[in-house]
Amino acid sequence: RFPGTTLDKIEIPLDDGSFIYDTPGIIHRHQMAHYLTAKNLKYISPRKEIKPKTYQLNPEQTLFLAGLGRFDFVSGERQGFTAFFDNELQLHRTKLQGASDFYQKHAGTLLVPPTSKELKEFPELVRHEFTINEKTDVVFSGLGWIRVNEKAKIAAWAPMGVDVVIRKAII
């Protein structure tokens, strides 16, 4: 299973007698899937309904998205951030101060994927800074998103080549 590999139109019947159609997708080179091994695709390809997780963060706290990315709450009022990622992806909260050292020490061991062996080929994380003024999703392309509910300054880190964008919250 590799995201974006539907080869032909697939007709999916719905209960009311209508249909939806799954069509071949577009390969987007700025998605996480292109930086993972086949065995690690399970962390970004949900097989069950995603269970959002809400984290109450104080300013200057960080959420690691396993070893695949990082979300820094730089400043703002304490608030809940809701993470929408595959249920298998482990998120880890820590203080912003020392977060880079924490990543260097634990990427590939506590923060997996990627494993320590895969980390040698994994692109470095790149920082993207955003000032949020309304309910907004911070999207890690091909991985998931974090909903920011109130005004905040945040930094989102993703592997070089993976897009991080913001959009008006969809949920």
Show where each model-derived region lies:
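Helix-rich effector regions associated with P-loop NTPase G domains
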Residues: 1-171
